[in-house]
A protein has these predicted regions:
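Signal-transmission linkers at sensory-effector interfaces
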Residues: 1-23, 34, 159, 163-172
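GAF sensory/regulatory domain recognition
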Residues: 30, 42-65, 94, 133
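Short beta-strand-to-loop transition segments that serve as allosteric relay/switch motifs
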Residues: 59, 128-144
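Signal-transducing coupling segments at domain and membrane junctions
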Residues: 61-63, 90-112, 139-142
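Acidic/proline- and glycine-rich, intrinsically disordered low-complexity segments
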Residues: 63-87
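A short, aliphatic-rich beta-strand micro-motif
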Residues: 111-120
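Flexible loop/coil segments at beta-strand boundaries within sensory signal-transduction domains
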Residues: 119-124, 133, 167
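Amphipathic alpha-helical "output/dimerization" segments
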Residues: 139-165
């Protein structure tokens, strides 16, 4: 099978996936975040030369979902998209691959990130992320992720991939 025609970022808006799929995807991300004691998740889908956050949860989701574009030549999530390799990274600020674009826009700092490729029909369609953040001027200690947290989001990505496949293959 080949990836569905069109850009993955357009699948929801253009009706390529049914109306239930985004709701189920949102619920799956929220449940996985709860299992790893985190608040912030996002589903980023490919849109040419950038990744678009299509769904998200957490206190800042409404401020960037549908209104931000992550260039594919910057950031850890772009590296995950290009390589197809998941990442569980703590001390994000010290990683030169980290793109501060979204942090600066939201007035936060990202402390830790889990980023996993979303594979649909054998091809990478996007990334799911879970992050620990705090206010940019915070003195509270940073939170971290662990290997089991990466496992949780790899499972979520596999489920989401199958969910999108089933929705894209449905007969109208």
């Amino acid at each position: 099978m080949e990836l569905h025609p069109g850009r993955p970022a357009d699948w929801i808006a253009d009706g390529s996936v049914d109306e239930v799929t985004p709701t189920l995807a949102q619920e799956l991300l929220a449940r996985s975040a709860d299992r790893v004691s985190a608040q912030n998740t996002a589903l980023w889908l490919s849109s040419g030369d950038h990744l678009d956050p299509i769904l998200g949860s957490g206190p800042h989701a409404d401020e960037f979902v549908g209104d931000f574009r992550q260039p594919l030549d910057r950031g850890i999530i772009s590296m995950v998209y290009a390589s197809g390799q998941p990442v569980c990274e703590n001390a994000i600020a010290s990683n030169p691959q980290h793109s501060p674009l979204l942090d600066q826009r939201l007035g936060i700092q990202t402390d830790a990130m889990v980023a996993v490729p979303l594979v649909v029909m054998g091809e990478i369609a996007g990334i799911i992320t879970c992050v620990h953040t705090r206010p940019a001027d915070s003195s509270e200690p940073p939170k971290e992720f662990h290997a089991a947290d990466l496992d949780e989001f790899e499972f979520a990505a596999a489920c989401l991939g199958r969910l999108f496949e089933a929705s894209l293959l449905r007969e109208d």
